[in-house]
Swiss-Prot record:
This is Phosphate acyltransferase. GO terms for biological process: fatty acid biosynthetic process; phospholipid biosynthetic process. SUPFAM superfamilies: Isocitrate/Isopropylmalate dehydrogenase-like. It comes from the Bacteria. Homodimer. Probably interacts with PlsY. It comes from Paracidovorax citrulli (strain AAC00-1) (Acidovorax citrulli).
Length: 344
């Protein structure tokens, strides 16, 4: 039985979405148990034999500064959910709340793994091969050193192997402005050197430099970048997908003939829209912590939040934390000062 601690108050829609998603998730996952964290008066209508309400009197808003969430709201649903992981009551916590606050709370309560300087946010983007490409970091670390990017690559490999059984040596690409080794700034060039060394020692399957379009081609399993670039790529991809879907709908409504064409093409269009629906890829892992935490989009609807729960459940069931620890320990000689001494 896998137990998830769910921050039911977080996100733009709060319990209205999170509770409905939790109910659907429980119906489809008989080996899962949920700790529903939030204000009891908002959660009182939820009853299920595999769900338990954990009271929390405060809520971290999407606008709360990190210091407010961390130091003043010590009984927030977000913090109490992460505390369940620290205490061993749950294997993973899930929240749609304020990203900065969640990262700060998770890092404060759970601490980073030995060998990791900074946690990273990782999620998946759909690709042309019918699968998904894992991209990290997506905003936790705007400025990164080459050593940080190497750590992200090691953690990303562990995540992909946990999500996709049989993919023990996923291909890693370094996001750059060109495939050539001479391209990129000094941090990227140095990162390339470290990743090639990791490949030579058998710690990573490094493909080489990749460009932005390779994310969607499915050229590699994992794309590594700093948080600034990753967040821009994520938001741009979601915007393009929404634009294409919207444009198709407009064009098929243009005349009686296009409406007839839409009816004929409906099965293909339906499958295409499903593949491009970013809600189905919701759920970003906060990697590098001594516990599992997943971040959902703040604007997530029921479908999207359920997907975040599913992704969190799958990684916990497939021992993501142990996989990250193992890969980091194996790559310790390459990871820099953080790997040389245990965390306090």
């Amino acid at each position: 039985m896998i137990t998830l601690a769910v921050d039911c108050m977080g996100g733009d829609h709060g319990p209205r979405v999170t509770l409905a998603a939790c109910r659907q998730f429980l119906e489809h996952h008989p080996q899962a148990r949920l700790l529903l964290v939030g204000q009891p008066e908002s959660l009182g209508g939820f009853a299920h034999e595999r769900a338990q309400i954990v009271p929390a009197s405060e809520v971290v808003s999407m606008d709360d500064p990190v210091e407010v969430a961390l130091r003043r709201k010590k009984d927030s649903s977000m913090r109490v959910a992460v505390q369940q992981v620290k205490d061993g009551a749950a294997q993973v916590a899930v929240s749609a709340g304020n990203t900065g606050a969640l990262m700060a709370i998770a890092r404060y309560l759970l601490k980073t793994l030995d060998g990791i300087d900074r946690p990273a946010i990782a999620t998946q983007m759909p690709n042309a091969r019918g699968g998904a490409t894992t991209v990290l970091d997506l905003g936790a670390n705007v400025d990164c050193s080459a050593e940080h990017l190497l750590q992200f690559a090691v953690m990303g490999a562990a995540l992909v192997s946990a999500l996709h059984e049989g993919t023990e040596e996923p291909a890693v690409g370094l996001l750059n402005i060109g495939e050539e080794v001479i391209k990129g700034n000094e941090v990227i060039k140095r990162t390339g050197e470290l990743l090639r060394s990791a490949a030579e020692s058998g710690d990573l399957n490094f493909y080489g430099n990749v460009e932005g379009n390779d994310i969607f081609k499915g050229t590699v399993d994992i794309v590594v970048c700093d948080g600034f670039v990753g967040n821009v790529a994520l938001k741009a991809s979601e915007g393009v997908a929404s634009m294409i879907v919207g444009a198709l709908k407009q064009e098929f409504k243009r005349s009686i003939f296009t409406k007839i064409a839409a009816v004929v093409a409906y099965p293909v269009l339906s499958a295409l829209m499903r593949r491009m629906d970013h809600r189905r890829y919701n759920g970003a892992a906060l990697l590098g912590l001594r516990g599992l935490v997943f971040k959902s989009h703040g604007s997530a609807d029921i479908l999207a939040f359920e997907q975040a729960l599913i992704r969190a459940y799958d990684t916990a069931r497939n021992n993501l934390l142990d996989r990250v620890r193992s890969r980091v320990a194996h790559a310790a000689p390459l990871l820099g000062p953080a790997a040389a001494q245990p965390s306090p």
